């Protein structure tokens, strides 16, 4: 299966809600519409999860999507880094919890 932005939104919203994620941004090949069957899922999340709780979120995403995932918390991204630029250039918000 080649994942789309909509696929990611639908599949991951329950996971984000369960783990208390306040915002999730999809970036990389899926966000750009250039994904292949081998593409991983690249996500930036705004959460208060640390340590094993963050690992639990990553594992839940991996289980739901059955794909390799790269998940970064907003606190992991160095401002102005190449990754920060990529997220801002290609990122699409796929989840926002308005609590």
Segment roles from a protein language model:
Residues 1-23, 32-37, 48-99:
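Catalytic core of pol beta-like nucleotidyltransferases
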């Amino acid at each position: 299966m080649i994942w789309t932005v909509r696929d990611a939104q639908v599949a991951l919203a329950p996971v984000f809600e369960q783990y208390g994620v306040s915002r999730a941004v999809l970036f990389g090949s899926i966000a750009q519409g250039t994904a292949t069957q081998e593409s991983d899922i690249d996500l930036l999340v705004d959460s208060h999860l640390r340590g094993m709780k963050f690992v639990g979120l990553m594992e839940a995403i991996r289980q739901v999507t059955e794909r390799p995932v790269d998940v970064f918390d907003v606190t992991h991204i160095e401002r102005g880094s190449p990754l920060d630029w990529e997220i801002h250039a290609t990122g699409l918000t796929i989840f926002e919890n308005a609590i």
